[in-house]
Amino acid sequence: MVSSISMFYDLPDPVQFAKDIYSVLDTDGIWTCEQSYLLSMLRTNSIDTICHEHLEYYSLYQVKEIADRANFKIIDVKFNDCNGGSFRIYFAKRESTLYNENCELINKILKEEIDYGILNDNIFENFLSDCDIEVKRLRDFVDIVNKNGKKIYVYGASTKGNCLLQYANLCEVDMKYAVERNPKKIGKMTNTGIKIIGEETMRENPPDYLLVLPWHFREEIIVREKEFLDAGGQFVFPFPHFEIIGSKPKALISGCDGMIAHYVKDCFTDYNLYGIGHSEPNYETNITNFYFDMNNSNTLEHTLSIIKPDVIIHLASISSSHYAFNNPIETLRCNGLLTAQICDIIHRKGWNTKLFNASSSEIYKGHIDYSVKENDHNMFHLHPYSIAKTMGHSMVEFYRNVYGLPFSNGVIFTTESPLKKPVFLLNKVTNHIKEWKNGNKSVLQVGNLDSYRNILHASDVANAIHTIVSQKNGDTYLICNSESHKVYDLVIKLYSNYGIELEKKDNILYERATGLDVIIIQDKQLGFDSIPTNIRGEATKLRELGWKPLVNIETILGELV
Protein backbone atom coordinates (compact mmCIF):
# COMPACT_ATOMS: atom_id res chain seq x y z
CA MET A 1 0.00 0.00 0.00
CA VAL A 2 1.07 3.57 -0.75
CA SER A 3 -0.67 6.55 0.86
CA SER A 4 -0.40 10.25 -0.01
CA ILE A 5 -2.27 12.51 2.39
CA SER A 6 -2.79 16.26 2.01
CA MET A 7 0.03 16.72 -0.46
CA PHE A 8 -1.25 15.77 -3.91
CA TYR A 9 -2.25 19.40 -4.60
CA ASP A 10 1.37 20.51 -4.03
CA LEU A 11 2.82 18.58 -6.99
CA PRO A 12 4.25 20.35 -10.05
CA ASP A 13 3.70 17.17 -12.13
CA PRO A 14 0.91 15.02 -10.65
CA VAL A 15 0.80 12.61 -13.63
CA GLN A 16 4.48 11.76 -13.25
CA PHE A 17 3.95 11.37 -9.49
CA ALA A 18 1.16 8.86 -10.17
CA LYS A 19 3.39 6.98 -12.64
CA ASP A 20 6.17 6.85 -10.02
CA ILE A 21 3.75 5.32 -7.52
CA TYR A 22 2.70 2.82 -10.18
CA SER A 23 6.33 1.80 -10.59
CA VAL A 24 6.79 0.94 -6.88
CA LEU A 25 3.34 -0.52 -6.18
CA ASP A 26 2.70 -4.26 -6.08
CA THR A 27 0.49 -5.65 -8.85
CA ASP A 28 -2.41 -6.07 -6.42
CA GLY A 29 -1.41 -3.17 -4.18
CA ILE A 30 -3.55 -0.14 -3.34
CA TRP A 31 -2.68 3.52 -3.53
CA THR A 32 -4.86 5.79 -1.37
CA CYS A 33 -4.80 9.55 -1.85
CA GLU A 34 -6.65 12.14 0.24
CA GLN A 35 -6.91 15.91 -0.23
CA SER A 36 -9.42 18.74 -0.22
CA TYR A 37 -12.30 18.37 -2.65
CA LEU A 38 -12.80 21.15 -5.17
CA LEU A 39 -16.60 21.09 -5.06
CA SER A 40 -16.58 21.31 -1.26
CA MET A 41 -14.27 24.31 -1.52
CA LEU A 42 -16.61 25.99 -4.00
CA ARG A 43 -19.78 25.15 -2.08
CA THR A 44 -18.44 26.40 1.26
CA ASN A 45 -16.78 29.56 -0.09
CA SER A 46 -13.45 28.30 1.25
CA ILE A 47 -11.24 31.02 -0.17
CA ASP A 48 -8.81 30.22 2.67
CA THR A 49 -8.09 26.82 1.08
CA ILE A 50 -6.21 28.70 -1.65
CA CYS A 51 -2.74 29.26 -0.23
CA HIS A 52 0.87 29.51 -1.37
CA GLU A 53 1.69 25.79 -1.19
CA HIS A 54 -1.29 24.55 -3.21
CA LEU A 55 -0.72 24.32 -6.95
CA GLU A 56 -3.86 22.42 -7.90
CA TYR A 57 -7.43 21.92 -6.69
CA TYR A 58 -9.04 18.63 -7.62
CA SER A 59 -12.42 17.20 -8.33
CA LEU A 60 -12.82 13.55 -9.31
CA TYR A 61 -12.96 14.63 -12.95
CA GLN A 62 -9.28 15.69 -12.89
CA VAL A 63 -8.20 12.76 -10.72
CA LYS A 64 -9.81 10.30 -13.16
CA GLU A 65 -7.81 11.87 -16.00
CA ILE A 66 -4.57 11.45 -14.01
CA ALA A 67 -5.46 7.85 -13.16
CA ASP A 68 -6.13 7.00 -16.80
CA ARG A 69 -2.79 8.48 -17.91
CA ALA A 70 -0.89 6.57 -15.21
CA ASN A 71 -2.71 3.26 -15.92
CA PHE A 72 -4.66 3.21 -12.64
CA LYS A 73 -8.30 2.36 -12.04
CA ILE A 74 -10.39 3.91 -9.26
CA ILE A 75 -11.91 1.26 -7.00
CA ASP A 76 -13.54 3.50 -4.36
CA VAL A 77 -14.15 7.14 -3.38
CA LYS A 78 -15.08 8.35 0.10
CA PHE A 79 -15.96 11.88 1.22
CA ASN A 80 -15.49 13.46 4.65
CA ASP A 81 -15.79 16.88 6.32
CA CYS A 82 -12.10 17.21 7.21
CA ASN A 83 -10.76 20.75 6.64
CA GLY A 84 -13.94 21.95 5.02
CA GLY A 85 -14.47 18.89 2.83
CA SER A 86 -12.03 16.27 1.54
CA PHE A 87 -12.17 13.11 -0.52
CA ARG A 88 -10.13 9.91 -0.36
CA ILE A 89 -9.61 7.92 -3.55
CA TYR A 90 -8.49 4.30 -3.69
CA PHE A 91 -6.53 3.21 -6.79
CA ALA A 92 -5.40 -0.17 -8.11
CA LYS A 93 -3.31 -1.02 -11.12
CA ARG A 94 -5.40 -1.50 -14.21
CA GLU A 95 -4.01 -5.00 -14.73
CA SER A 96 -4.92 -6.09 -11.19
CA THR A 97 -7.51 -8.87 -11.19
CA LEU A 98 -8.15 -8.53 -7.45
CA TYR A 99 -10.01 -5.20 -7.72
CA ASN A 100 -12.63 -3.90 -10.14
CA GLU A 101 -13.13 -0.30 -11.14
CA ASN A 102 -16.20 1.14 -9.40
CA CYS A 103 -17.77 2.50 -12.57
CA GLU A 104 -21.22 3.08 -11.08
CA LEU A 105 -19.89 5.28 -8.27
CA ILE A 106 -17.43 7.09 -10.53
CA ASN A 107 -20.07 7.91 -13.13
CA LYS A 108 -22.46 9.12 -10.43
CA ILE A 109 -19.87 11.52 -8.98
CA LEU A 110 -18.72 12.71 -12.40
CA LYS A 111 -22.31 13.48 -13.36
CA GLU A 112 -22.79 15.50 -10.16
CA GLU A 113 -19.61 17.46 -10.88
CA ILE A 114 -20.53 18.19 -14.48
CA ASP A 115 -24.07 19.17 -13.47
CA TYR A 116 -22.57 21.55 -10.90
CA GLY A 117 -20.61 23.17 -13.73
CA ILE A 118 -17.09 21.92 -13.15
CA LEU A 119 -16.31 22.34 -16.87
CA ASN A 120 -17.59 25.91 -16.91
CA ASP A 121 -15.28 28.75 -15.86
CA ASN A 122 -18.29 30.70 -14.58
CA ILE A 123 -18.42 28.63 -11.40
CA PHE A 124 -14.99 29.95 -10.42
CA GLU A 125 -16.03 33.53 -11.11
CA ASN A 126 -19.16 32.95 -9.03
CA PHE A 127 -17.03 31.39 -6.30
CA LEU A 128 -14.83 34.47 -6.06
CA SER A 129 -17.87 36.74 -6.11
CA ASP A 130 -19.55 34.76 -3.31
CA CYS A 131 -16.35 34.75 -1.25
CA ASP A 132 -16.01 38.50 -1.68
CA ILE A 133 -19.55 38.96 -0.35
CA GLU A 134 -18.74 36.97 2.81
CA VAL A 135 -15.38 38.69 3.26
CA LYS A 136 -17.02 42.12 2.91
CA ARG A 137 -19.50 41.17 5.63
CA LEU A 138 -16.58 40.15 7.83
CA ARG A 139 -14.58 43.27 7.05
CA ASP A 140 -17.54 45.58 7.66
CA PHE A 141 -18.48 43.84 10.90
CA VAL A 142 -14.94 44.12 12.27
CA ASP A 143 -15.07 47.85 11.51
CA ILE A 144 -18.41 48.16 13.33
CA VAL A 145 -17.09 46.27 16.37
CA ASN A 146 -14.16 48.66 16.61
CA LYS A 147 -16.37 51.73 16.17
CA ASN A 148 -18.48 50.46 19.06
CA GLY A 149 -15.39 50.31 21.25
CA LYS A 150 -15.66 46.55 21.56
CA LYS A 151 -12.92 43.94 21.19
CA ILE A 152 -12.59 41.19 18.60
CA TYR A 153 -9.69 38.71 18.60
CA VAL A 154 -8.65 35.97 16.21
CA TYR A 155 -9.28 32.41 17.43
CA GLY A 156 -6.79 29.90 16.01
CA ALA A 157 -3.75 31.17 14.08
CA SER A 158 -3.83 28.47 11.41
CA THR A 159 -2.25 28.42 7.94
CA LYS A 160 -5.62 28.70 6.24
CA GLY A 161 -6.63 31.39 8.70
CA ASN A 162 -3.61 33.49 7.77
CA CYS A 163 -4.72 33.27 4.15
CA LEU A 164 -8.09 34.72 5.13
CA LEU A 165 -6.51 37.50 7.20
CA GLN A 166 -4.43 38.53 4.21
CA TYR A 167 -7.32 38.27 1.75
CA ALA A 168 -9.56 40.36 4.04
CA ASN A 169 -6.69 42.74 4.89
CA LEU A 170 -7.21 42.29 8.63
CA CYS A 171 -4.24 43.31 10.75
CA GLU A 172 -3.24 44.46 14.24
CA VAL A 173 -5.18 47.71 13.75
CA ASP A 174 -8.39 45.67 13.45
CA MET A 175 -7.67 42.97 16.04
CA LYS A 176 -5.15 43.28 18.83
CA TYR A 177 -4.57 39.58 19.47
CA ALA A 178 -4.80 36.13 17.93
CA VAL A 179 -5.57 33.35 20.43
CA GLU A 180 -3.76 30.03 20.01
CA ARG A 181 -3.52 26.78 22.01
CA ASN A 182 -0.24 25.67 20.38
CA PRO A 183 2.52 26.93 22.75
CA LYS A 184 5.03 27.08 19.87
CA LYS A 185 3.04 29.90 18.25
CA ILE A 186 2.57 32.04 21.38
CA GLY A 187 4.59 35.26 21.27
CA LYS A 188 4.84 35.22 17.49
CA MET A 189 2.67 37.13 15.00
CA THR A 190 0.36 36.32 12.14
CA ASN A 191 1.41 37.31 8.63
CA THR A 192 -0.60 40.52 9.03
CA GLY A 193 1.08 41.51 12.30
CA ILE A 194 -1.44 40.33 14.91
CA LYS A 195 0.28 39.21 18.12
CA ILE A 196 -0.42 35.61 19.19
CA ILE A 197 -1.35 34.97 22.83
CA GLY A 198 -2.34 31.83 24.72
CA GLU A 199 -5.90 30.80 25.47
CA GLU A 200 -5.49 31.29 29.22
CA THR A 201 -4.31 34.86 28.68
CA MET A 202 -7.43 35.53 26.62
CA ARG A 203 -9.70 34.04 29.30
CA GLU A 204 -8.33 36.43 31.93
CA ASN A 205 -9.75 39.35 29.93
CA PRO A 206 -11.96 37.93 27.19
CA PRO A 207 -13.00 39.98 24.14
CA ASP A 208 -16.56 40.57 23.02
CA TYR A 209 -16.06 38.55 19.83
CA LEU A 210 -13.73 35.81 18.58
CA LEU A 211 -13.18 35.42 14.83
CA VAL A 212 -12.85 31.66 14.32
CA LEU A 213 -10.29 30.92 11.60
CA PRO A 214 -10.49 27.08 11.88
CA TRP A 215 -14.20 27.42 11.11
CA HIS A 216 -14.41 23.85 9.81
CA PHE A 217 -14.34 22.68 13.45
CA ARG A 218 -17.33 24.82 14.35
CA GLU A 219 -19.28 22.33 16.49
CA GLU A 220 -16.24 21.21 18.47
CA ILE A 221 -15.22 24.82 19.16
CA ILE A 222 -18.72 25.80 20.30
CA VAL A 223 -18.71 22.93 22.81
CA ARG A 224 -15.14 23.61 23.90
CA GLU A 225 -15.70 27.33 24.50
CA LYS A 226 -19.10 27.05 26.20
CA GLU A 227 -17.86 29.14 29.13
CA PHE A 228 -16.89 32.01 26.81
CA LEU A 229 -20.31 31.94 25.15
CA ASP A 230 -22.23 31.65 28.43
CA ALA A 231 -20.37 34.71 29.73
CA GLY A 232 -21.76 36.76 26.82
CA GLY A 233 -18.98 36.30 24.26
CA GLN A 234 -19.85 35.65 20.63
CA PHE A 235 -18.14 33.72 17.85
CA VAL A 236 -17.78 35.02 14.31
CA PHE A 237 -17.62 32.29 11.65
CA PRO A 238 -16.50 33.66 8.26
CA PHE A 239 -17.55 30.67 6.13
CA PRO A 240 -19.40 28.99 4.55
CA HIS A 241 -21.55 32.04 5.23
CA PHE A 242 -20.71 34.85 7.63
CA GLU A 243 -22.43 34.15 10.93
CA ILE A 244 -22.38 35.45 14.50
CA ILE A 245 -23.05 32.82 17.16
CA GLY A 246 -23.69 33.26 20.88
CA SER A 247 -25.46 31.45 23.70
CA LYS A 248 -28.35 33.94 23.42
CA PRO A 249 -30.56 34.70 20.43
CA LYS A 250 -29.86 37.93 18.53
CA ALA A 251 -32.29 40.84 18.63
CA LEU A 252 -31.96 43.79 16.25
CA ILE A 253 -33.54 47.08 17.31
CA SER A 254 -34.16 49.65 14.59
CA GLY A 255 -34.39 53.19 15.87
CA CYS A 256 -31.94 52.18 18.59
CA ASP A 257 -31.55 55.77 19.83
CA GLY A 258 -35.26 56.31 20.42
CA MET A 259 -37.22 56.47 23.65
CA ILE A 260 -38.85 53.03 23.51
CA ALA A 261 -35.57 51.47 22.34
CA HIS A 262 -33.88 52.69 25.54
CA TYR A 263 -36.28 50.59 27.62
CA VAL A 264 -36.21 47.66 25.19
CA LYS A 265 -32.43 47.43 25.69
CA ASP A 266 -32.96 47.22 29.45
CA CYS A 267 -35.73 44.63 29.06
CA PHE A 268 -34.08 42.31 26.51
CA THR A 269 -31.18 41.11 28.66
CA ASP A 270 -31.82 37.55 27.48
CA TYR A 271 -30.71 38.53 23.95
CA ASN A 272 -27.47 39.61 22.30
CA LEU A 273 -28.44 43.08 21.12
CA TYR A 274 -27.76 44.88 17.85
CA GLY A 275 -29.08 48.26 16.82
CA ILE A 276 -29.59 50.44 13.77
CA GLY A 277 -29.62 54.19 14.25
CA HIS A 278 -29.69 57.22 11.99
CA SER A 279 -28.76 60.06 14.32
CA GLU A 280 -25.36 60.99 15.74
CA PRO A 281 -23.60 57.72 16.67
CA ASN A 282 -24.02 56.75 20.32
CA TYR A 283 -22.12 53.57 21.12
CA GLU A 284 -23.02 51.61 24.26
CA THR A 285 -21.66 48.62 26.16
CA ASN A 286 -24.72 46.35 26.00
CA ILE A 287 -25.44 46.66 22.26
CA THR A 288 -23.54 46.73 18.97
CA ASN A 289 -24.88 49.58 16.85
CA PHE A 290 -24.84 50.27 13.10
CA TYR A 291 -25.48 53.82 11.87
CA PHE A 292 -26.81 54.46 8.37
CA ASP A 293 -29.92 55.57 6.48
CA MET A 294 -32.29 52.59 6.55
CA ASN A 295 -33.98 53.86 3.39
CA ASN A 296 -30.85 52.70 1.54
CA SER A 297 -32.20 49.23 0.74
CA ASN A 298 -28.80 47.79 -0.29
CA THR A 299 -27.13 48.82 2.96
CA LEU A 300 -30.15 47.60 4.92
CA GLU A 301 -30.04 44.14 3.32
CA HIS A 302 -26.25 43.96 3.74
CA THR A 303 -26.53 44.82 7.44
CA LEU A 304 -29.36 42.36 8.10
CA SER A 305 -27.31 39.68 6.32
CA ILE A 306 -24.39 40.37 8.66
CA ILE A 307 -26.49 40.08 11.81
CA LYS A 308 -29.08 37.47 10.71
CA PRO A 309 -31.20 38.37 13.75
CA ASP A 310 -33.55 35.95 15.44
CA VAL A 311 -35.81 38.90 16.28
CA ILE A 312 -36.20 42.33 14.68
CA ILE A 313 -37.85 45.01 16.81
CA HIS A 314 -38.71 47.66 14.25
CA LEU A 315 -39.15 50.97 16.06
CA ALA A 316 -37.54 53.36 13.57
CA SER A 317 -39.92 55.94 12.16
CA ILE A 318 -40.65 59.62 11.80
CA SER A 319 -42.49 60.28 15.05
CA SER A 320 -43.23 64.00 14.83
CA SER A 321 -46.75 64.63 13.56
CA HIS A 322 -45.77 68.15 12.50
CA TYR A 323 -42.72 66.93 10.53
CA ALA A 324 -44.75 64.14 8.91
CA PHE A 325 -47.44 66.62 7.86
CA ASN A 326 -44.87 68.78 6.07
CA ASN A 327 -42.87 65.87 4.59
CA PRO A 328 -45.43 63.28 3.44
CA ILE A 329 -43.25 61.49 0.86
CA GLU A 330 -40.35 61.02 3.26
CA THR A 331 -42.83 59.85 5.90
CA LEU A 332 -44.31 57.28 3.52
CA ARG A 333 -40.82 55.93 2.83
CA CYS A 334 -39.73 55.81 6.48
CA ASN A 335 -42.94 54.71 8.17
CA GLY A 336 -44.41 52.51 5.45
CA LEU A 337 -42.08 51.36 2.69
CA LEU A 338 -39.21 50.63 5.09
CA THR A 339 -41.37 48.14 7.00
CA ALA A 340 -42.26 46.46 3.70
CA GLN A 341 -38.57 46.23 2.76
CA ILE A 342 -37.71 44.51 6.04
CA CYS A 343 -40.54 42.02 5.49
CA ASP A 344 -39.36 41.38 1.94
CA ILE A 345 -35.72 40.81 2.94
CA ILE A 346 -36.68 38.26 5.59
CA HIS A 347 -38.98 36.48 3.13
CA ARG A 348 -36.47 36.38 0.24
CA LYS A 349 -33.64 35.19 2.48
CA GLY A 350 -35.76 32.34 3.79
CA TRP A 351 -35.08 33.31 7.41
CA ASN A 352 -37.43 32.44 10.26
CA THR A 353 -36.78 35.80 11.92
CA LYS A 354 -39.52 37.09 14.19
CA LEU A 355 -40.54 40.66 13.41
CA PHE A 356 -42.19 43.13 15.76
CA ASN A 357 -43.46 46.24 13.99
CA ALA A 358 -44.31 49.31 16.04
CA SER A 359 -47.72 50.22 14.67
CA SER A 360 -49.71 53.11 16.13
CA SER A 361 -53.17 53.94 17.43
CA GLU A 362 -52.92 56.99 15.13
CA ILE A 363 -54.10 54.76 12.26
CA TYR A 364 -57.59 54.96 13.82
CA LYS A 365 -57.46 58.67 14.66
CA GLY A 366 -59.73 59.69 11.78
CA HIS A 367 -62.67 58.15 13.68
CA ILE A 368 -62.31 60.99 16.23
CA ASP A 369 -64.12 59.05 19.00
CA TYR A 370 -63.42 55.34 18.72
CA SER A 371 -62.77 52.20 20.76
CA VAL A 372 -60.21 50.03 18.96
CA LYS A 373 -60.83 46.27 19.05
CA GLU A 374 -58.32 43.45 18.75
CA ASN A 375 -57.67 42.65 15.05
CA ASP A 376 -59.44 45.87 14.10
CA HIS A 377 -59.04 46.53 10.36
CA ASN A 378 -61.25 49.61 10.38
CA MET A 379 -58.38 52.08 9.97
CA PHE A 380 -59.31 55.69 9.27
CA HIS A 381 -56.38 57.94 8.45
CA LEU A 382 -56.32 61.66 7.70
CA HIS A 383 -52.64 62.43 8.18
CA PRO A 384 -49.42 61.37 6.36
CA TYR A 385 -48.13 59.80 9.59
CA SER A 386 -51.12 57.49 9.99
CA ILE A 387 -51.32 56.77 6.24
CA ALA A 388 -47.70 55.57 6.26
CA LYS A 389 -48.16 53.61 9.50
CA THR A 390 -51.21 51.92 8.00
CA MET A 391 -49.10 50.83 5.03
CA GLY A 392 -46.43 49.31 7.29
CA HIS A 393 -49.06 47.64 9.48
CA SER A 394 -50.82 46.16 6.45
CA MET A 395 -47.60 44.83 4.87
CA VAL A 396 -46.74 42.98 8.09
CA GLU A 397 -50.16 41.34 8.03
CA PHE A 398 -49.76 40.50 4.34
CA TYR A 399 -46.48 38.63 4.85
CA ARG A 400 -47.79 36.88 7.95
CA ASN A 401 -51.05 35.74 6.38
CA VAL A 402 -49.72 34.83 2.92
CA TYR A 403 -46.35 33.29 3.82
CA GLY A 404 -46.96 32.20 7.42
CA LEU A 405 -44.06 34.27 8.76
CA PRO A 406 -43.83 35.07 12.51
CA PHE A 407 -44.51 38.79 12.06
CA SER A 408 -46.39 40.85 14.66
CA ASN A 409 -47.86 44.33 14.83
CA GLY A 410 -48.05 46.12 18.15
CA VAL A 411 -50.60 48.95 18.00
CA ILE A 412 -48.93 51.30 20.46
CA PHE A 413 -50.98 54.03 22.13
CA THR A 414 -49.53 57.26 23.57
CA THR A 415 -46.19 56.52 25.20
CA GLU A 416 -44.44 58.77 27.69
CA SER A 417 -41.19 58.92 29.63
CA PRO A 418 -38.62 61.58 30.52
CA LEU A 419 -36.66 60.46 27.44
CA LYS A 420 -39.35 61.59 25.01
CA LYS A 421 -38.30 64.40 22.70
CA PRO A 422 -39.05 67.91 24.02
CA VAL A 423 -41.24 68.75 21.00
CA PHE A 424 -44.02 66.53 22.37
CA LEU A 425 -46.65 68.21 24.52
CA LEU A 426 -46.12 66.88 28.05
CA ASN A 427 -42.34 67.19 27.78
CA LYS A 428 -42.80 70.68 26.34
CA VAL A 429 -44.98 71.50 29.35
CA THR A 430 -42.48 70.14 31.88
CA ASN A 431 -39.66 72.14 30.31
CA HIS A 432 -41.86 75.24 30.54
CA ILE A 433 -42.52 74.51 34.23
CA LYS A 434 -38.77 74.36 34.90
CA GLU A 435 -38.25 77.66 33.10
CA TRP A 436 -41.16 79.26 34.95
CA LYS A 437 -39.84 78.12 38.34
CA ASN A 438 -36.44 79.55 37.41
CA GLY A 439 -37.92 82.98 36.77
CA ASN A 440 -38.51 82.85 33.01
CA LYS A 441 -42.19 83.88 32.76
CA SER A 442 -42.56 83.48 28.97
CA VAL A 443 -45.90 82.17 27.70
CA LEU A 444 -46.21 78.63 26.27
CA GLN A 445 -48.29 78.21 23.11
CA VAL A 446 -50.03 74.84 22.64
CA GLY A 447 -52.69 73.27 20.45
CA ASN A 448 -56.08 71.90 21.49
CA LEU A 449 -56.11 70.34 24.98
CA ASP A 450 -59.56 68.73 24.85
CA SER A 451 -58.42 65.37 23.43
CA TYR A 452 -58.19 62.23 25.54
CA ARG A 453 -55.06 60.10 25.58
CA ASN A 454 -54.55 56.47 26.56
CA ILE A 455 -51.09 56.76 28.11
CA LEU A 456 -48.42 54.14 28.83
CA HIS A 457 -44.93 54.36 30.23
CA ALA A 458 -42.27 53.35 27.69
CA SER A 459 -41.01 50.60 30.03
CA ASP A 460 -44.44 48.95 29.91
CA VAL A 461 -44.33 49.09 26.11
CA ALA A 462 -40.90 47.41 26.17
CA ASN A 463 -42.25 44.63 28.38
CA ALA A 464 -45.19 44.20 26.01
CA ILE A 465 -42.81 43.85 23.06
CA HIS A 466 -40.83 41.19 24.94
CA THR A 467 -44.04 39.28 25.63
CA ILE A 468 -45.06 39.48 21.96
CA VAL A 469 -41.77 38.24 20.48
CA SER A 470 -41.73 35.39 23.01
CA GLN A 471 -44.73 33.88 21.24
CA LYS A 472 -44.15 31.23 18.59
CA ASN A 473 -46.41 32.77 15.96
CA GLY A 474 -47.07 36.31 14.82
CA ASP A 475 -50.24 38.28 15.60
CA THR A 476 -51.55 41.81 16.05
CA TYR A 477 -51.76 43.20 19.58
CA LEU A 478 -53.10 46.36 21.19
CA ILE A 479 -50.55 47.90 23.57
CA CYS A 480 -52.61 50.24 25.72
CA ASN A 481 -53.89 51.05 29.17
CA SER A 482 -57.37 50.53 30.58
CA GLU A 483 -58.16 54.21 31.02
CA SER A 484 -57.75 57.46 29.12
CA HIS A 485 -57.06 60.96 30.42
CA LYS A 486 -58.05 64.36 29.13
CA VAL A 487 -54.93 66.23 28.04
CA TYR A 488 -56.20 69.45 29.66
CA ASP A 489 -56.41 67.71 33.05
CA LEU A 490 -52.88 66.34 32.71
CA VAL A 491 -51.47 69.78 31.91
CA ILE A 492 -53.27 71.36 34.88
CA LYS A 493 -52.01 68.56 37.15
CA LEU A 494 -48.39 68.94 36.01
CA TYR A 495 -48.36 72.65 36.86
CA SER A 496 -50.22 72.04 40.12
CA ASN A 497 -47.70 69.39 41.20
CA TYR A 498 -45.09 72.13 41.21
CA GLY A 499 -47.14 74.82 42.94
CA ILE A 500 -48.43 76.61 39.85
CA GLU A 501 -52.23 76.73 40.04
CA LEU A 502 -53.86 77.67 36.73
CA GLU A 503 -57.20 79.23 35.88
CA LYS A 504 -58.76 79.36 32.40
CA LYS A 505 -60.25 82.40 30.69
CA ASP A 506 -61.17 82.00 27.01
CA ASN A 507 -58.06 80.45 25.44
CA ILE A 508 -55.69 81.63 28.18
CA LEU A 509 -54.45 79.69 31.19
CA TYR A 510 -53.09 82.10 33.78
CA GLU A 511 -51.44 81.68 37.18
CA ARG A 512 -53.98 82.21 39.94
CA ALA A 513 -51.46 83.70 42.38
CA THR A 514 -49.95 86.31 40.03
CA GLY A 515 -52.48 86.68 37.23
CA LEU A 516 -49.67 86.12 34.71
CA ASP A 517 -50.53 84.35 31.45
CA VAL A 518 -48.92 80.90 31.38
CA ILE A 519 -50.42 79.12 28.35
CA ILE A 520 -52.13 80.25 25.16
CA ILE A 521 -54.28 77.58 23.49
CA GLN A 522 -54.31 77.80 19.68
CA ASP A 523 -57.14 75.54 18.56
CA LYS A 524 -56.62 75.89 14.80
CA GLN A 525 -52.91 75.30 14.64
CA LEU A 526 -53.00 72.35 12.22
CA GLY A 527 -56.47 72.22 10.71
CA PHE A 528 -57.98 68.80 11.43
CA ASP A 529 -55.54 68.29 14.36
CA SER A 530 -57.58 70.91 16.20
CA ILE A 531 -60.48 68.44 16.48
CA PRO A 532 -60.46 66.74 19.90
CA THR A 533 -60.07 62.96 19.67
CA ASN A 534 -60.62 60.04 22.01
CA ILE A 535 -59.04 56.84 20.67
CA ARG A 536 -59.03 54.06 23.28
CA GLY A 537 -58.71 50.29 23.49
CA GLU A 538 -58.30 47.20 25.64
CA ALA A 539 -55.14 45.06 25.51
CA THR A 540 -57.11 41.82 25.81
CA LYS A 541 -54.61 39.53 24.06
CA LEU A 542 -51.60 40.81 25.98
CA ARG A 543 -53.36 40.56 29.32
CA GLU A 544 -54.23 36.94 28.54
CA LEU A 545 -50.48 36.37 28.09
CA GLY A 546 -49.80 37.82 31.54
CA TRP A 547 -48.76 41.35 30.58
CA LYS A 548 -50.16 44.42 32.30
CA PRO A 549 -48.97 48.03 32.68
CA LEU A 550 -47.01 48.55 35.89
CA VAL A 551 -46.48 52.33 35.84
CA ASN A 552 -49.51 54.48 36.70
CA ILE A 553 -50.24 57.96 35.41
CA GLU A 554 -49.14 59.67 38.65
CA THR A 555 -45.71 58.06 38.40
CA ILE A 556 -45.45 58.98 34.72
CA LEU A 557 -46.22 62.64 35.44
CA GLY A 558 -43.88 62.62 38.43
CA GLU A 559 -41.00 61.35 36.31
CA LEU A 560 -41.42 64.04 33.68
CA VAL A 561 -40.26 66.98 35.77
Predicted regions and their residues:
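A short glycine-rich, Lys/Arg-flanked "PGG" loop and its adjoining helix->strand segment in the class I
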Residues: 15-30
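Conserved beta-strand signature within the Rossmann-like core of class I S-adenosyl-L-methionine
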Residues: 28-36, 234-238
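Short, glycine-/aromatic-enriched active-site segment of Class I SAM-dependent methyltransferases
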Residues: 33-56, 60-62
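Flexible, glycine-/basic-rich loop-and-beta segments that form/coincide
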Residues: 83-132
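N-terminal Rossmann NAD(P)H-binding glycine-rich loop of SDR-like oxidoreductase domains
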Residues: 251-269
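NAD(P)H-binding glycine-rich loop region in Rossmannoid oxidoreductase-like domains
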Residues: 294-334
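Catalytic helix-loop patch of NAD(P)-dependent Rossmann-fold dehydrogenases
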Residues: 326-341, 354, 363-409, 416-422
